[in-house]
Amino acid sequence: MSQHYRTLLSIGIPIMIGQMGMIVLSFADTMMVGHHSTTELGAASFVNNIINLAIITGTGFSYGLTPVVGALFGRGEQAEAGQALRCSLLTNTLAAVAMMTVLLVLYFNLGNLGQPVELLGYMRPYYMVLFASLPFVMLFNAFKQFTDSITLTRTSMWILLSGNLLNILGNYIFIYGKMGAPEMGVVGAGVSTLLSRIIMVVIFIVVFMRSRRFAAYREGFFKLGWSRPLLRRLNSLGTPIALEMGMETASFSLSIIMVGWLGTIALASHQVMTTISQFTFMVYYGLGAAVALRTSYFHGQRDVQNVRHTVTAGLHLMVMLEVVLGGTIFLLRNHIGAWFTDSTEVSSTVLTLLLPFFIYQFGDGMQINYANALRGIADVKPLMLIAFIAFFVISLPVGYLCGFVLGYGLMGVWMAFPFGLTSAGVMMWWRFRRYK
């Protein structure tokens, strides 16, 4: 098992660092917007939850490339892996168009979702700027899943970190109106995000086209052309993963509508804790991605024993991460709210959300580990049903029950998350047990 621990960490740590870079960026966005205006923080909270639903759903779709390239890499078929990247760029672009159509419909109905009227003027322009960045997110995801699947995880790590540094600099310039730029507030945060996402895609294209380590993959990318069976396989693998991750995120994003009924302070507090929650989620997902990569590698070699050992090692490491991250956040609990806003009311409300946050950490890590194990072995169709039961049949009704029927307010809405995530983890573990 020790070899599996080392391998998972060597692959997973660069992914975790890249993911943490994304969350540091989210921290920076939230802190810089929050200190500019609590009202803008509330608007950003609502818009980010909707746009992040599309981004995470799209990211899930791009994960369909992982078992394909991972298995090809395990068999040494580099040209075919390059062809798979080409096909993934097409399917990801088409997925972006589909999601943007839905987002456009939502944009024209923002005023009908029961949100505070004073926030709509901030929501609409910020929404459209982030809307424009979605195609670049999907193109980046295709390149990232490809390089991660051939174990070059440091490539995406460095590109992500570079893009995030540019984004933070852009936030400073556009939110506060520095270096001759107009003071744009929350819209400036969106402009900075859009520019950084475009730049990251350009960097990835240059690296893929110029680096010698991708030479064999470039040959397949340009010479093997389009493959209809491969396009269908990417769709058949990516769609269930997209729906599973989308339903999980939707349980959070739809909760934001209920939170909006509680007012601006509740929305701002929810955004602060969502940012903290995203940090732990992304770290767990970095390790989960390593589990998916290693299971797809061994699955391509028909090595059942090492698939199982990899998944068990992943669960052990996941529990260690939960203890370390949960303990750190507990020690810093009295300072978290002040990092993001000057409002003492928001800071005190944030403290009430820490209990459900700590409770659901194990369930979150468990479902991430086994979801990625199932993706690695390409057993993805059951994920849709599991996600529907866990997040729509269990989580959302429990959130409404605790938050409004029983009268626990924002904390009640958050109490639903432990129920949904833990039930998802148990069902995914049960499904993986059948692997032979």
Put a short name on every predicted segment.
Residues 20, 24-42, 110-117, 173-184, ...:
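Helix-terminus/linker motif at the lipid-water interface of multi-pass membrane proteins
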Residues 1-15, 69-133, 181-239, 295-360, ...:
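Short alpha-helical transmembrane segments in multi-pass integral membrane proteins
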Residues 10-29, 129, 140, 163, ...:
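Transmembrane helical elements of multi-pass membrane transporters/channels
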Residues 38-49, 123, 127, 190, ...:
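Small-residue hotspots at the loop-to-helix junctions and early N-terminal turns
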Residues 3-31, 35-36, 52-64, 68, ...:
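N-terminal transmembrane alpha-helices
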Residues 62, 130-148, 156-164, 189-205, ...:
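Short runs within selected transmembrane alpha-helices of multi-pass transporters and secretion channels
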Residues 41-104, 140-151, 155-156, 256, ...:
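Small-residue-rich hydrophobic transmembrane alpha-helices
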Residues 17, 21, 25, 54-58, ...:
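Residue-level hotspots within pore-lining transmembrane alpha-helices
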